[in-house]
Amino acid sequence: MRHAHRFVTTRLDRLSGVKRQISGWILLVTLLVVVSATQWWVFRGAYTETTYANGGTYSEGVLGPLETLNPLFARSSAEKSAARLLFASLYHYDATGHLKGDLAESIATNEAETEYTVTLKKGLQWSNGTELNAEDVLFTINLLKNPDARTEFSGWQSINVTLVDAHTIKFTLSSPYAPFAHSLTFPILPKHILNEVPASSLREHTYSRSPTVTSGPFALRLLQDGTSDGTKKIVHMVANPRYHGG
């Protein structure tokens, strides 16, 4: 019995030692893997750079009805998403949420903060090659002020807007309003396309369903029914080669 006891005890001691050796090797291998992965990640961040390839397809899924592509009537998330891709504004918000000039090059105000003068960037064009200028801005604001247009924008009736020149427009407020620049994020429409369209008919006009002339990073190629009953829409867009943002 004593011999058997010594034999079993010796085997158990050896087995315990083997387990400790295996555990040590597992720990060592794990540490090597972690160190190697860390070195690879640091190397990747230091010596590689993310680049973008030309071409390809951009897809975006959004919820909500798509009844219009006219940005002045955009109400659902789908309509607003399409508007941001098709139309430029005087100002927009960048990825960090800061207000940034889009079509606008600069803005100046008087000491009383009742006059704001916006200067447009030079060389702006619509997707058909026609110049985009301050007359388009004034035309759009007049639509916002016109109750017959029934747009989704309000609060412009008390603001006086005048052209200074082809690339400059002045806004005169009845009282000081320091954050006025944040009101200049509305999309601009082309006067040379819509000037003869009555404001009361703009919502139902062909342009509102198929805006063939735009100013954003994309131009419309096709609006397609995604289902047989027309409840889902697919908007096909192509890059706008005349987009001022490149």
Residues covered by each model-derived region:
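Surface-exposed binding/hinge segments that line
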Residues: 39, 153-200, 219
